[in-house]
Design a protein with these regions (language model features):
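Short, solvent-exposed loop/beta-turn-alpha elements that line the ligand-binding surface or hinge
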Residues: 46-51, 201, 270-279
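N-terminal signal peptide c-region/cleavage motif recognized by signal peptidases
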Residues: 15-18
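Conserved C-terminal helix/tail region of periplasmic/extracytoplasmic solute-binding proteins
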Residues: 288-312
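Short, glycine-/small- and polar/acidic-enriched structural segments
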Residues: 23-151, 158-159, 175-181, 204
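Secondary-structure end/capping motifs
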Residues: 218-295
Length: 312
């Protein structure tokens, strides 16, 4: 073999090895995935994962998020509300919890129009309430009704996703709306609404969880460590720079005014912490409540979930 042939062969082997080493990380996000949206915009996660040979593909979901969680087509998933995470467990989806956003109880609420005769949860009896089925807001509604001595049978729940719920609330076809930020903040600052209950009333903590496919988590703990650290640092940055974060997020959230984004972010903790089984009592309470309300098909033991723990 000539020197030229040796050089060519070596080049081909190097190219093949490089191509083999290059891997794709698929990440899903939704409108409420503040930290993912910022990382997609600033490219910081890609920079940190590049030495490991990873490129990142981002996938936005407005609907069908549960299907994507179950299908395994995404490696790291949009952060989901506490209640929503239970549906993945009920579906036996092979997912690993690798991070948690600490409690943000004020980030969702039950609201009515300012002129409404409804002034308390008890006044919801016989009324129509818009809520996203199976969401964290759904649990807030059930908890609020229970505290007032009512059940879902005492109202007419109208199960609508956030955009449709907003339309129904605006045109008066529902009496109340159970909603989360930034939709909640938009209603407060751009419309005449009143809050009749939120999580600060001791009804729900509203945690959020970050999930990975278990196969990916087992194969790439180094990627999870970098992702966890980057999410935590991004959350700290948002809280330390509220106005700057709002000005970045506003256009990315559909041209929401910075003041609205800032109001919404003020109610989110963005405190990224490890998931610990001993701290999931509220998850078990939600699971039991949802099984009793026939929102999930079977009883769940939340301690059965798979958890990945980051290095300190």
């Amino acid at each position: 073999m000539t020197l030229k042939q040796l050089i060519l062969a070596a080049s081909l082997l190097f190219a093949a090895a490089a191509a083999h080493a290059e891997q794709t990380l698929d990440i899903s996000y939704q409108r409420s995935s503040t930290l993912w949206i910022l990382l997609k915009q600033n490219g910081q996660l890609e920079q940190r994962l590049k030495p490991l040979g990873f490129t990142v593909n981002w996938h936005e979901f407005s609907t069908g998020l549960l299907s994507s969680l179950n299908a395994g087509s995404v490696n790291l998933h949009a952060d989901v509300a506490d209640a929503f995470a239970l549906f993945t467990q009920a579906a036996d989806a092979p997912l690993t919890y690798y991070a948690q956003e600490n409690s943000s109880p004020g980030a969702q609420a039950i609201i009515v129009q300012d002129a409404s005769p409804i002034h308390s949860i008890a006044d919801l009896k016989g009324k129509t309430v818009a809520v996203s089925k199976g969401s964290g807001s759904n649990f807030l509604l059930i908890s609020a009704l229970h505290k007032a001595g009512l059940t879902l049978a005492d109202i007419t729940p109208r199960y609508l996703e956030a955009p449709d719920g907003g339309a129904a609330f605006s045109n008066g076809s529902v009496d109340a709306w159970v909603i989360w930020d930034p939709f909640f903040a938009t209603q407060q600052l751009e419309h005449h609404v009143r809050v009749i209950a939120d999580g600060n009333d001791g009804l729900t903590n509203y945690n959020r969880f970050y999930l990975a496919t278990t196969q990916f988590a087992n194969a790439h703990p180094d990627v999870l460590q970098i992702t966890f650290d980057t999410l935590r640092e991004t959350g700290q940055w948002v809280k330390a720079h509220p106005r700057q974060a709002a000005e970045i997020l506003g256009p990315l959230w559909g041209n929401i005014p910075p003041a609205t984004v800032e109001r919404a972010n003020s109610r989110r903790s963005y405190d990224i912490i490890p998931v610990k089984l001993q701290n999931l009592a509220e998850q078990q309470r939600i699971a039991d409540t949802y099984y009793g309300a026939k929102l999930i098909p079977k009883p769940l033991n939340v301690s059965d979930i798979t958890v990945w723990t980051p290095k300190p």
